[in-house]
Swiss-Prot record:
Keyword Acyltransferase set for record: yes
Organism in which the protein naturally occurs: Streptomyces cyaneus
GO molecular function: 3-oxoacyl-[acyl-carrier-protein] synthase activity
Name under which the protein is recorded: Putative polyketide beta-ketoacyl synthase 1
Enzyme Commission number(s) from the entry: 2.3.1.-
Amino acid sequence: MTRRVAVTGIGVVAPGGIGVPAFWDLLSSGRTATRGITLFDPEGLRSRIAAECDFDPLAHGLDPELVERADRYIQFALVAADEAVTDSGIDFGTENPWRVAVSLGSAVGGTTRLEHDYVLVSERGQRWDVDHRAAEPELHRAFSPSTLAADVAERFGAQGPVQTVSTGCTSGLDAVGYAFHTIEEGRADVCIAGASDSPISPITMACFDAIKATSPNNDDPEHASRPFDAHRDGFVMGEGAAVLVLEELEHARARGAHVYCEIGGYATFGNAYHMTGLTSEGLEMARAIDVALDHARVDPTDIDYVNAHGSGTRQNDRHETAAVKKSLGAHAYDTPMSSIKSMVGHSLGAIGAIEVVACVLALARQVVPPTANYETPDPECDLDYVPRTARPRRLDHVLSVGSGFGGFQSAVLLTGPAGRKR
């Protein structure tokens, strides 16, 4: 018998919204969190704007010693995980630790700390024969992507399968998808799943500057991210984390947990085409959607909302529009599709998990978040992108899709309580 997978807890650290209530308030209002960069001096960069988190780790209960050693992205994940676990009401002291898993994603790991320590060991980049004596003993733990899952597992005593997923901008979706499979296939009863990234750092911003992927609209940052709009000119870098507590459905019911929704299907494919390029037909994303729907035994005409990758680059938004039309057929024109990146930016590996939490909340509130700043239609992007204002709507089946550098294409299907009764 197939094991069903429930979402019983959610937590989020996002630009403009630390914690679930503040996050949903931002999304439902259509406000944007993009401002000028304050985390470092961006002088000389083409894109000098970002969606930063107003984040004080000590104010959110993290231990000062941990804050000293842990990179910002680890801090985000721990705060989001604390919120999700508290929300779920689960008591890990009564759980079998071998049946508790962790699946977390990150695209760039602790680059902020790595850049900082490179300055220390190289005399601000002036030495190639680095002074190893200046390296901090916690550096490896601070920047290694494996630390993300390890630190969260240690915090909650999880001794089941523990993994960090790094598949570029689909890392968060894939971490949730792998968690779903881990429970569905019987390898765990509970999984702490999600993703975290803090990529607003000089080298990371410079990398995306170099390929002109980020918006140069420095004079009007609040309107810089405009997915699907004819005048879009790149994405806005963001940061943050989202964590979900996933449980085998009967396990959740047995302890009387509140069930937000179920994860019904997941799929991921590669395009074997180009590191950053996308095929114009959207075949690989369409394939991911098709397989996720088939996994969930949901018909394309049952989809009530698509949470788009919607990065705001010229090629992505065309590619994604084509993929959704290929998978949903004529129903695509009747299905609202929006991008929350217009409000919280693109936090690379973290955004997929943040978007899954947005989908959980959309199902819970029966409201579709808008695409902020969408004003001028693009003839090649001709679907309903929910411009500027959130929209009440019956939602039973919600699809979240993602696209990552390296050719990764992923999709997760979420089903609300009423969806199983259709």
